[in-house]
Design a protein with these regions (language model features):
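Long, highly charged, low-complexity intrinsically disordered interaction regions
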Residues: 9, 23-222
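Intrinsically disordered, low-complexity, Ser/Thr/Glu/Asp/Lys/Arg-enriched terminal regions and linkers
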Residues: 4-25
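Conserved catalytic cores of phosphodiester-cleaving nucleases, focusing on short active-site segments
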Residues: 1
């Protein structure tokens, strides 16, 4: 059978559903692990203590999610109308919010943080073998760095972390990052003058400052 110019072998629904169940289980397990890793990463970022090894493991998890997502989409096409529930599960586990977070994390750590370069990096990561994805030096090379080892300290821009704060509207995170250059520079400044964030379009600078300190696990002024 041909759908949108792509050929599909007709398989029994039971066979397809067996694959679906395995893929959904992979997505669930990997997503749980990824969420825990991202929470830990946020804390490390705010403490300025992220290493290349920390982000390598997370990029690997994102790619496991992407691969399972691609395979599950094929199953949904094969299931036709019976694939609606599976589609809902896919959106819940690996929807657009995950793609956005992946893009922002790449931009946070790439030597060139442009959206166009992030797209190229995602394509390169998708082509890498699981072995290469687990190798910090291979990942560093894709991000645009040479001569780094797994213990090398990585300084994020802060796009991903800022995007998690509700008072940071679309486009505001970019302005903040352009001004400060790194999340740590931002943290250093808001400890002295949080209201300055209002200059970049943050309607409630105190809320943003408080949110960042809560993520860090400290109270404002005691960092």
């Amino acid at each position: 059978v041909y759908v949108h110019g792509k050929s599909y072998e007709i398989q029994p629904v039971t066979t397809i559903m067996s694959s679906v169940n395995q893929l959904v289980a992979t997505l669930q397990t990997t997503r749980q692990s990824l969420d825990r890793s991202l929470l830990r990463l946020t804390a490390l970022e705010l403490d300025d203590y992220v290493t290349l090894a920390d982000i390598t493991g997370i990029f690997s998890s994102f790619e496991i999610m992407q691969q399972a997502k691609t395979e599950l989409k094929d199953c949904i096409v094969k299931l036709g109308n019976q694939g609606k529930l599976v589609q809902m599960q896919l959106e819940q586990l690996a929807g657009s919010s995950m793609d956005t977070e992946y893009d922002l994390m790449i931009r946070d750590y790439a030597s060139d943080s442009s959206e166009a370069n992030a797209e190229k990096i995602r394509a390169e990561l998708a082509r890498m073998t699981p072995k290469d994805l687990s190798d910090p030096q291979h990942v560093a090379a894709v991000l645009g760095y040479d001569d780094l080892d797994e213990d090398s300290v990585m300084t994020p821009l802060g796009l991903r972390t800022l995007s998690r704060v509700s008072v940071v509207r679309d486009g505001v995170a970019e302005k903040i990052v352009d001004e400060y250059g790194s999340l740590q520079e931002l943290m250093d400044d808001i400890s002295e003058d949080p209201e300055r964030l209002g200059d970049f379009g943050v309607n409630n600078p105190a809320i943003l400052a408080d949110s960042l300190y809560r993520m860090k696990g400290t109270k404002q002024g005691n960092a």
